[in-house]
From Swiss-Prot:
GO terms for biological process: protein retention in ER lumen; protein transport; retrograde vesicle-mediated transport, Golgi to endoplasmic reticulum. Residues 1-5, 117-118, 174-185 are lumenal. Keywords: Endoplasmic reticulum, ER-Golgi transport, Membrane, Protein transport, Receptor, Transmembrane, Transmembrane helix, Transport. Belongs to the ERD2 family. The chain crosses the membrane at residues 6-26, 38-58, 59-79, 99-116, 119-139, 153-173, 186-206. Residues 27-37, 80-98, 140-152, 207-219 are cytoplasmic. It holds the Pfam family ER_lumen_recept. It comes from Saccharomyces cerevisiae (strain ATCC 204508 / S288c) (Baker's yeast). InterPro entries: ER_ret_rcpt (IPR000133). The keyword Membrane applies. GO terms for cellular component: cis-Golgi network; endoplasmic reticulum; endoplasmic reticulum membrane. This is ER lumen protein-retaining receptor. It is a multi-pass membrane protein.
Length: 219
């Protein structure tokens, strides 16, 4: 069993549970990017279309895929539902969530056309999801950079998401050295890009949060 894969999945699962717990128990959505959460829902829906073929690698793999689709969609529903339960917070969230995601969608679509394993619908959808996931956090980071401060649980959520992607780099190295000696270059370089996007956040998280100072991204 690949320990880095398990740790990465646990970190990802933890990040989602942190966010759901935050929204459900406090109804506090300030600092959360609705656009990033919508992109993540799109990422997992397009990535795991192979569930419809019923060619599952393992029960664990299938259950994790279903969880990520359902949970990310549920987060979007919770955020959208705040329009009715907390109208002021919902409007403020949208007002600050101004990153133009059409650039990310078009860029990911183009990358999937140029970089894919096979020119089939499922493979193109998978490649699109990988490239989109690598940049889906940008609206959230952009929102934080504009606002400067945010709720600590949101910061911990972003850290857990970044850790999940960072752990997938040693996961690919482990698989290359112990399995078939084949490196999935699309997943590797997209994951590397995503980890680099988190690098500034990781540094500030360590210097400000871990060391007990207030969190604030540079504008």
């Amino acid at each position: 069993m690949n320990p880095f894969r398990i740790l990465g999945d646990l970190s990802h699962l933890t990040s989602i549970l942190i966010l759901i717990h935050n929204i459900k128990t406090t109804r506090y959505i300030e600092g959360i990017s609705f656009k990033t959460q919508t992109l993540y829902a799109l990422v997992f829906i397009t990535r795991y279309l192979d569930l419809l073929t019923f060619h599952w690698v393992s029960l664990y793999n299938a259950l994790m895929k279903i969880f990520f689709i359902v949970s990310t969609a549920y987060i979007v529903v919770l955020l959208q539902g705040s329009k009715r339960t907390n109208t002021i917070a919902y409007n403020e969230m949208l007002m600050h969530d101004t990153f133009k995601i059409q650039h990310l969608l078009i860029g990911s679509a183009l990358m999937s056309v140029f970089f894919h394993h096979k020119f089939t619908f499922l493979e193109l959808a998978w490649s699109f999801s990988v490239w989109l996931e690598s940049v889906a956090i940008l609206p959230q980071l952009y929102m934080l950079s504009k606002g400067g401060k945010t709720r600590s649980l949101t910061v911990h959520y972003i850290f857990a998401m970044g850790l999940y992607r960072a752990l997938y780099i040693p996961n690919w190295i482990w698989r290359y050295s112990t399995e078939d000696k084949k490196l999935d270059k699309i997943a590797f370089f997209a994951g590397l890009l995503q980890t680099l996007l988190y690098s500034d956040f990781f540094y500030i998280y360590y210097t400000k949060v871990i060391r007990g100072k207030g969190f604030k991204l540079p504008k």
